Amino acid sequence: MKWNETGRVWEEDHGMLDAEQVAQCERADKAEPLRAPIPTRMISNGEYMPVRQTEQQRRVEARVEELADDASRRLGISRRKFLHSSGGMAATLLAMNEVFGRFFDVSLVEMFEPAACAAAGPPRDLFVFDDQLHFVRGSKPSPAGLRAIAQGPSSAPTVKSNPFNPRGQLDERGESWGVWDPKLVGLPIDAGYAHITRFIKDVYLDSQVTIGLLSNVTASMVQIEGEKARAPRNAEEAQRAEILTAAQTAAARNFINEISGSTRMLCHGMLYVGKGNLAYIQEQIDQNEPDSWKGYNISNAAKVDNDPNSLMRQWRHDDEEVAYPTFELVQKNYERIKDRKPGFNNICVHKGLAPGPPDPLRGHPGDLPKAARDWPKLNFISYHSCIQPNFFMADTLKDIQADKLRGGVPDISWTTEYAQLVKDLPNCYAEIGTTWASSIVTFPTVAAHIMGQLMKFMGEDRILFGSDSVWYGSPQWQIEALWRFQIPEALREKYGYPALTESAKRKILGLTSAKLYGIRAVDAGSYKPVPKDYESRMSKDLKTLLEFEKVTADNMSKMKETYAALAIDPDNTRYGWMRV
């Protein structure tokens, strides 16, 4: 099916461009003369009609060409070689700043000096605490759709179109399926990309993450043989459908910390709420010693009674009968073990990324104020900052452009409302996983407003970085984007947003989380590296627990290592169709 925007209906879709449409296009690898590091026109994989290059894209392309010609002459190299270098990326970011507004901290000297380009990136001493990391147990496949949204059209044939943009809307670069992380382009999406062997490489060898918080997902539906899919009856039954169980999460944390000889990972416990789940919460505390808790309002994770046959359901933070007994148990144990687990009182809950009405059961923030006031010793960390749009921000950008306001700033559903609701509640914190990833590259205007509003209403001390990796590859591209990002002066003046200073970035990227989890050492150099031979150190018992019958070095990791050893520059070739 395809979306007809004019009639606002779904229509039959035969899947590929027809002959008449193809006649209006040209192959992207032939039609794009410049091949800048970032595309300057929309590319189609053949399943949707690309739009013509916009005026803003033409201006970016012309400016990149001008900068590249000048720089390549000065450096005595070809324009093509220049565009393949870090200088080419700097030139493209400079051109985008000139056309779209100054979103990225980049200077002219970076076009000529690779060292300057590196120096402008995240410093080596940067302490990074990634509040949201995921991997999948070995018996389950990695989710293709989440990787595809970050990888773009090269995800085909596994994923043939943007899974979160069925209407073919355009981002700020004029693309309906823009690449978030260029390093993913061309890699196959296989069932093991989010398994532990590649997870460790992506997070601890390929990024600046100092400490990572391994998260998990409370299962909402289970498939029992002979039955239709349904909500689980209890937390034990829900384990069948979890991407990672509480025991597996804790075992991975223990393994990584043991082989590195320092605290490189913390882990969540599974927040199954309700009277009927209290015994399971205590069991996790006694057996796994989680560092904090992760839950989902939208998940059927609340056991409201002790009837063994009743199904679990969704829940709210402010439900005194359902959530409060769980909060009471967490707080009671926190008083007992807080010296050993200082972040145990952090209640992290997925909020947002859910189309539909503004209901706390779907992640709306309306249930937070009462709970935060009733439980001042608990910290309520809202993952994704309650953003409602599901991975693609085109409608949000239109609302901003239409000057649709709430409290004097553009109304970004439900993030603006969230920031204003909890602004005076010091135990409420905003985590930006996926919200940041889905906006920083493709919708930088939206990213600027989100960051500006969180800083304006909640302050730089209550915003936490999370990458939601490894769904979107290594966290490094998000770390670099945040370090280089800035809120344009025009937006700051119009809406009263604070500047995103280096001090603020250091807090967001790690220092605030360090305080929440009682981490005293915030010098990245004081943490020992995860050894490169981590795979050979995995015990048979650990492999069995993580449901890997045989864990071996995957071919893709070997290919990436070979590619890096050859020091091959990316050629910026795009594949697909462009409108002519």
Predicted regions and their residues:
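N-terminal secretory signal peptides
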Residues: M1-I77
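C-terminal segment of N-terminal export signals and the immediately downstream linker at the start
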Residues: W3, G7, D69-I77, M96-L133
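Active-site gating loops and adjacent loop-to-helix segments of metal-dependent hydrolytic enzymes
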Residues: R52, S139-Y193, R230-N234, D307, ...
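Mid-to-C-terminal alpha-helical segments outside catalytic/metal-binding sites
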Residues: D70, G76-N97, P143, P157-D202, ...
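Divalent metal-dependent hydrolysis catalytic cores, especially in the metallo-beta-lactamase
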Residues: V128-H134, A150-A191, K201-E227, R264-M270, ...
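Histidine-centered divalent metal-coordination motifs
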Residues: Q132-G138, H350, H384
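Active-site gating/metal-coordination segments in enzymes
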Residues: R137, N216-G363
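Catalytic pocket-lining loop regions of alpha/beta-barrel enzymes
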Residues: D291, N300-A302, D307-F465, G473, ...
